[in-house]
């Protein structure tokens, strides 16, 4: 565009004369000022000649138009290319966005799954830590309970030893009943420190106490390590037999009547042998007092056997004890209950002198002795609770229930001890004197008492441990059930989540497949549509070609048909002209014949002098004949074509001569069809001719006269100067020639009687226009 402007306006203006193009894109100072560039262009144009300007304009106009068109097509192509590139970029950017969105969604989903698994793992770790903390707390609690029970056992053993020492001192100081009672009443209980620091007086007592202590320790350690299978049969019997023992007042009262003069195991066996004999020989005792020693001996034997079996050491006599006593004791728990109930009321264990003394012997309860340790334990527990409140939430109800049970237990023991103390205080003095009078009847040593106490404590500990074990097992089962339920719920949730994930993935895949199938179907439909359109176009083109070919063929056929029809029409016209000429010739000959006939008739009548008939025709008929002679118009319509023919008198006088082979019966055969309008025209012309002929006045002739017509010959007629007389023929011969020429008549002959004046001419005309002649004409045409 700039180049065309430069060509139009010159090089100095920078394209200023290019119709305003130089103003917008010119190189000089005319950018943005189109008027200056136009003025420069006009000044340069005025400097040149008009011829050069006109020639240049005439040369530059088509060049600029061609360049503009070329540049416009290039611009359109460039714009179309830019649009295509822009569309492709948009599609690529959209696909990239879709891919990024899918990638982000996938990353988000994976992140959510990882976060969920991480949370589940953290929750599992927290549960494991919580379970470990609970287990550690339970073990610590069991250790503390074990230490507390051991401390209780040690304190009870120290108290028992203190009582035994006090008893020995009282028995050694006053051998009589009075002195012993007084000492026992006035002697206060020794403190724990004194009991522990005072050396024992008898070596047998110390050894028995040591053995009992070791046995208790071994029993405690062995029962802690016993499995559940070994504890179940024995613990069931012990639990029923030690319910009353654990809450009996023997724990608070101890066993004050223990013999301290036992020095060897042989002495113990002798005492065991003599005790039933002395009990059976004593008749002053009641049934209850007599039955108690035997029951006590049985219990002692059973307990010694169990302690020896669990401890694994002891005297040979204890090892050799038969197992029948153990089975009896385990199978009959009622005996232990009876002994526990009757043991405080026996004369051997009851000491009314202590209760009746002004300085009463007061046994401090176990709860009061354990208060400092319990306080320390409570403070420690409170600190642990404050330090780990989340971990102790599950253990707190257990500790509270355990402390509550222990407090109830201590309160019950205190109440039972007070009750027995009041009963002993209100008991009659005779029974006390009776018991005091027999110092050797129910005496036992310190070892037996320690063993009995250790057995009771062991049974209580076993029962407690069994209950604790059952409770822990129950809690463990509940915890496992809860964990199992939680695990199942978590598995179910994960299964549902995975199923949902699979369902979503399946749904997404189905949607993707459906979308792809739809795209494929759409592409296939488009391809089918394009193929259909292509086929339709091809079909239309083929139809157009076929139509064009058919049209061409039709036109060619029509042209051929028109040529053939034209040729046939020309032939028919020629034939009709020939027929018309022949008809006119025949008519002419008939007229000549008629004239000659009239002349002959007139001559005959003149000869006969018969003035009836005038031979001269009327003047109007002659005028008509004369008028018809010079010009004969023949108008024939064949397929909308009019043909006029003028026939002069000279031409009629010298008609055309046709070859011999044209007319076999006077006509030329033609193979083409003849239309009806031709025949109508012919019939009309014939009617006109008949009218002309009928208008003539012909004199009536008879049959004989017609027969006597002289002979007529066309050859003789052609020769001028010949007459009927010279020919030597009559009228009959002429009529015969006419009939031979025109053919036989196709109608019945009429008689002469029925003929009128005009019948002769009419007969001739009808003979000429007979149906046979028409058929011959139709066959010719």
Curated annotation (Swiss-Prot):
Keywords: Cell projection, Coiled coil, Cytoplasm, Cytoskeleton. One of its GO terms (biological process) is microtubule cytoskeleton organization. Residues 211-245, 257-267, 329-348 have a biased composition (Polar residues). Residues 1-32 have a biased composition (Gly residues). It is found in: Cytoplasm, Cytoskeleton, Microtubule organizing center, Centrosome; Midbody; Cytoplasm, Cytoskeleton; Cell projection, Neuron projection. Interacts (via N-terminus) with microtubules; facilitates microtubule stabilization. Interacts with kinesin-1 family members, KIF5A, KIF5B and KIF5C. PANTHER family: MAP7 DOMAIN-CONTAINING PROTEIN 2 (PTHR15073:SF3), MICROTUBULE-ASSOCIATED PROTEIN (PTHR15073). This is MAP7 domain-containing protein 2. The gene is Map7d2.
């Amino acid at each position: 565009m700039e180049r065309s402007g430069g060509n139009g306006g010159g090089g100095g203006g920078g394209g200023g004369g290019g119709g305003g193009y130089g103003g917008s894109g010119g190189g000089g100072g005319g950018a943005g000022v189109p008027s200056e560039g136009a003025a420069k262009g006009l000044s340069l144009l005025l400097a040149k000649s008009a011829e050069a300007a006109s020639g240049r304009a005439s040369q530059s106009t088509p060049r600029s138009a061609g360049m503009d068109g070329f540049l416009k097509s290039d611009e359109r192509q460039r714009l179309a290319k830019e649009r295509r590139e822009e569309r492709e970029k948009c599609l690529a950017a959209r696909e990239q966005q879709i891919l990024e969105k899918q990638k982000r969604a996938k990353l988000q989903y994976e992140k959510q799954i990882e976060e969920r698994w991480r949370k589940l793992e953290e929750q599992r770790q927290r549960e494991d830590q919580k379970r470990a903390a609970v287990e550690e707390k339970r073990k610590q609690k069991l250790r503390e309970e074990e230490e507390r029970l051991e401390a209780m056992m040690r304190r009870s053993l120290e108290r028992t030893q203190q009582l035994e020492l006090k008893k020995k001192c009282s028995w050694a100081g006053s051998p009589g009943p009075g002195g012993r009672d007084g000492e026992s009443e006035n002697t206060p209980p020794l403190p724990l420190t004194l009991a522990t620091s005072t050396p024992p007086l008898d070596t047998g007592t110390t050894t028995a106490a040591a053995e009992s202590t070791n046995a208790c320790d071994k029993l405690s350690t062995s029962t802690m390590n016993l499995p559940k299978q070994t504890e179940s049969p024995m613990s069931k019997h012990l639990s029923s037999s030690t319910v009353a023992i654990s809450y009996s007042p023997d724990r608070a009262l101890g066993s004050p009547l223990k013999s301290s003069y036992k020095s060897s195991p042989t002495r113990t066996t002798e005492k065991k042998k003599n005790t039933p004999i002395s009990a059976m020989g004593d008749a002053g005792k009641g049934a209850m007092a007599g039955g108690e020693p035997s029951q006590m001996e049985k219990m002692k034997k059973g307990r010694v056997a169990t302690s020896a079996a669990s401890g694994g050491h002891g005297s040979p006599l204890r090892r050799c004890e038969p197992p029948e006593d153990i089975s009896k004791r385990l199978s009959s728990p009622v005996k232990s209950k009876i002994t526990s109930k009757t043991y405080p009321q026996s004369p051997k264990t009851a000491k009314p002198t202590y209760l009746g003394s002004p300085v009463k012997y007061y046994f401090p309860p176990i709860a009061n002795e354990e208060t400092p340790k319990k306080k320390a334990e409570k403070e420690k527990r409170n600190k642990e609770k404050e330090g780990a409140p989340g971990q102790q939430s599950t253990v707190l109800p257990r500790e509270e229930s355990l402390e509550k049970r222990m407090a109830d237990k201590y309160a019950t023991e205190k109440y039972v001890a007070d009750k027995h103390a009041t009963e002993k205080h209100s008991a009659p003095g005779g029974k006390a004197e009776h018991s005091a009078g027999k110092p050797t009847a129910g005496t036992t040593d310190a070892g037996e008492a320690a063993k009995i106490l250790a057995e009771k404590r062991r049974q209580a500990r076993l029962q407690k441990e069994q209950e604790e074990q059952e409770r822990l097992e129950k809690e463990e089962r509940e915890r496992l059930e809860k964990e199992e339920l939680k695990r199942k719920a978590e598995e179910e949730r994960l299964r549902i989540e995975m199923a949902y994930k699979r369902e979503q993935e399946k749904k997404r895949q189905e949607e993707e497949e459906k979308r792809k199938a739809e795209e494929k179907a759409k592409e296939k439909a488009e391809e089918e549509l394009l193929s259909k359109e292509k086929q339709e176009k091809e079909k239309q083109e083929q139809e157009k070609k076929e139509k064009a070919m058919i049209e061409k063929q039709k036109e060619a056929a029509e042209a051929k048909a028109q040529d053939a029809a034209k040729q046939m029409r020309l032939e028919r016209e020629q034939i009709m002209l020939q027929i018309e000429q022949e008809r006119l010739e025949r008519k002419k000959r008939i007229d000549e014949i008629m004239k000659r006939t009239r002349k002959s008739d007139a001559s005959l009548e003149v000869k006969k002098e018969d003035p009836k008939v005038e031979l001269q025709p009327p003047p109007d008929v002659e005028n008509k004949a004369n008028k018809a002679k010079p010009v004969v118009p023949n108008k024939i319509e064949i397929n909308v074509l009019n043909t006029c023919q003028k026939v002069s008198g000279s031409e009629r006088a010298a008609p055309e001569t046709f070859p011999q082979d044209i007319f076999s019966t006077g006509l030329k055969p033609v193979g083409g069809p003849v239309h009806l309008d031709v025949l109508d025209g012919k019939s009309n012309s014939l009617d006109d001719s008949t009218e002309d002929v009928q208008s003539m006045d012909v004199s009536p002739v008879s049959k004989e006269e017609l027969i006597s017509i002289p002979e007529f010959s066309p050859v003789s007629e052609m020769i001028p100067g010949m007459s009927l007389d010279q020919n030597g023929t009559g009228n009959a011969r002429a009529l015969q020639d006419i009939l031979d020429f025109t053919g036989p008549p196709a109608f019945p002959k009429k008689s002469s009687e029925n003929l009128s004046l005009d019948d002769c001419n009419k007969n001739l005309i009808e003979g000429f226009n007979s149906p046979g002649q028409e058929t011959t004409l139709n066959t010719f045409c």
